[in-house]
Every structure is written in structure tokens, then in C-alpha cells.
Amino acid sequence: MKAEIHPDYHTIKVVMTDGTEYLTRSTWGKEGDTLNLDIDPKSHPAWTGGNAQIMDRGGRVSRFQKKFSGFLKKD
């Protein structure tokens, strides 16, 4: 394995949506940084079986719905 071509692999803290925290090793951020999750297995509809709306970050979903709202309408 070549030296000094791999990203730094260090310990970070991950905070889930319910406040649960755990330490893991990652190449994300710097040593000791905290990663706050917006969606995780405890809140994502795919894992919870719910049909909850996923938070529209940056208005992307809203813009898409507005742009294509009448595309498949049948009169």
C-alpha cells in the first residue's frame, strides 16, 4: 500500500435525530468533529414503515413539484 495517498481515518461523533450519540471512525471532517444527521434509520420512512414527508432542504422538492405539477393532469 502506498504511503500518504489515503485520506485521514479518524474518530468522529455522530448525533442521530433523537439525540443518540455514538463514536465511529470515518474520513469525514477532522478528528473529534460532530456529524449531526437530518435523516437516520430511526426517522426515515423507508425503515420506519411510515409515509412521513422527507424535509424539503433547499426547496428542491417544492421547485420540482411546481415545475411539473400539471405534467400528467387528465382533464
Curated annotation (Swiss-Prot):
A Pfam family this chain is assigned to: Ribosomal_L31
Gene: rpmE
One function term, GO molecular function aspect: rRNA binding
Keyword flag Nucleotide-binding: no
Protein family per UniProt: Belongs to the bacterial ribosomal protein bL31 family. Type A subfamily.
Source organism: Bradyrhizobium diazoefficiens (strain JCM 10833 / BCRC 13528 / IAM 13628 / NBRC 14792 / USDA 110)
SUPFAM superfamilies per record: L28p-like
Organism lineage string: Bacteria, Pseudomonadati, Pseudomonadota, Alphaproteobacteria, Hyphomicrobiales
Subunit structure: Part of the 50S ribosomal subunit.
Gene3D superfamilies assigned to the protein according to its UniProt record, in alphabetical order: Ribosomal protein L31 (4.10.830.30)
InterPro entries named in the record: Ribosomal_bL28/bL31-like_sf, Ribosomal_bL31, Ribosomal_bL31_A, Ribosomal_bL31_sf
Function: Binds the 23S rRNA.
Protein's name according to its UniProt entry: Large ribosomal subunit protein bL31
